[in-house]
Design a protein with these regions (language model features):
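Residue-level signal for inorganic ion chemistry
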Residues: 15-16, 58, 84, 123, ...
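Glycine/acidic-rich beta-strand-loop module
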Residues: 41-75
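Glycine- and acidic-residue-rich catalytic/RNA-contacting loop of pseudouridine synthases
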Residues: 20-32, 68, 85-133, 149, ...
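S4-like RNA-binding module at protein N-termini
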Residues: 1-26, 34-39, 63-64, 70-71
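Pseudouridine synthases involved in rRNA/tRNA modification
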Residues: 1-2, 6-10, 17-22, 150-224
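A short alpha->loop->secondary-structure connector
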Residues: 28-31, 73-80
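Short, solvent-exposed secondary-structure boundary/capping segments
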Residues: 131-137, 202
């Protein structure tokens, strides 16, 4: 269900497995509740991941720590980087996706042309063969389904994300790869490779991840 990546005085960082609920539902514990049971402490969620998404999550150990992380996330001071795989040729191979988002049908969201309160996403991509590209994504906002909608909007829904038109696969190929933030004047950086997924373990993907080990040091495409 999850792996503990770091256990600090005020927070833990875990790697959530794919296809695991964030919140408890249908009588089964979500990842936060399960971590609380395992560790025997109260944990506070400060951001979330969709069920299909694997990767890094910060869980605070106190309401004070949660308030600080919530402030940082709301002010976009936590840098987040994601990996995704998608089939097909995108409308552009790198750059940004920007636009307002709105609810659509079947729990979906859609990208609009308006810019009143836009979702902003920067990205790079690299071909890994068989018509598949690996995407490194940096969301500058935190909208629901933002990255899933961003890739679908440029013609390449995430592999395994059938809600947005992706081909069926062994998992949804979206992974929260890296986090950078400061807490109590100390800098923290965490990165973890995808824990599952046949396509994530291909030699071409593994080779490209060597080039993206420090995403915060890359020269990212400018966002308008």
């Amino acid at each position: 269900m999850y792996q503990i990546i770091a256990d600090e005085a005020d927070f833990i960082v875990i790697c959530k497995s794919a296809n695991i609920h964030f919140h408890s539902q249908d009588g089964s514990a979500g990842v936060v509740a399960q971590a609380e049971l395992d560790l025997g402490i109260k944990l506070y969620s400060v951001h979330r991941l969709d069920t299909l998404t694997s990767g890094l999550l910060i869980l605070a150990k106190s309401s004070a720590a949660a308030a600080e992380f919530t402030r940082q996330f709301s002010q976009h001071k936590v840098q987040k980087y994601y990996l995704a795989l998608a089939k097909g040729k995108p409308k552009k191979k790198q750059g940004w996706v920007i636009g307002d988002m709105a609810k659509s049908r079947r729990s979906m969201h859609k990208l609009l042309r308006s810019m009143d309160n836009p979702a902003k996403t920067q990205f790079f991509s690299h071909s890994v063969g068989d018509g598949i590209r690996l995407y490194l994504l940096k969301p500058l906002t935190g909208k629901t389904h933002q990255l899933r909608v961003a890739l679908a909007s440029i013609g390449v829904p995430i592999l395994g994300d059938e809600l947005y038109g992706g081909d069926a696969s062994d998992r949804g190929y979206l992974h929260a790869y890296s986090l950078n933030f400061s807490y109590k004047a100390q800098a923290y950086q965490y990165s973890v490779a995808p824990p599952s997924g046949v396509a994530f373990n291909s030699p071409a993907v593994i080779e490209q991840l060597q080039q993206w080990q420090s995403p915060e040091q890359l020269t990212w495409p400018k966002v308008k």
